[in-house]
């Protein structure tokens, strides 16, 4: 062997390869259903949205003013946690920030806890070990606070608020429970509530619409990009 000179085959040199691994949990949230109840009759509209839509189209519900007092409107959301890294780990807690104008009803949300101040949380996935590439799902339902002045855009936000892996690795591109919208452990889902003048209006500009007649009242579930 010749010191300080690289010659293949000499025994005074060797190579060592290191594989870098990382921990990365990502969250996606989207509206799956718009639910309208009038006098005990429930009508469910599937939005057809998927977690890959970014940004997600707004789900619009247009209500007949004359029927307003007899209506209950709910929105069902799905939350997907995906392990995008190389290290298996857990989403120990998910926190959801309920927007003004919507409310959390415990009876609709088994496994969720009301933390107060329009914040709810769940540990439904705390014991679910997510292997690299694996996903797990939870759902949450929020109810519109009925009122002619409670209209407009309502944006619901969810975030991974606690994670864990047995390597002690931090998420490579997110910090749990820090409310930073640019990070991939947080996502939002928008809905829009409006009042009609009595006649149904269907807009064709962007997206598509589904028209539903409920006991004489007209409700427009419209999905479009702002």
Show which residues each predicted segment covers:
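C-terminal membrane-anchoring or membrane-association module
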Residues: 212-226
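Extracellular/luminal low-complexity Ser/Thr/Pro-rich, glycosylation-prone repeat/linker regions
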Residues: 1-58, 159-198
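A surface/secretory-pathway sequence property marking extracellular, secreted
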Residues: 32, 41-44, 48-49, 90-132
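Low-complexity, intrinsically disordered segments enriched in Ser/Thr together with acidic residues
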Residues: 73-77, 124-154, 162-165
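Short beta-strand elements of extracellular/lumenal beta-sandwich folds
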Residues: 57-90
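Juxtamembrane/start-of-transmembrane alpha-helix segments at the extracytoplasmic/lumenal side
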Residues: 196-210
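Solvent-exposed, conformationally flexible loop/turn segments
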Residues: 39-40, 66-72, 133, 198
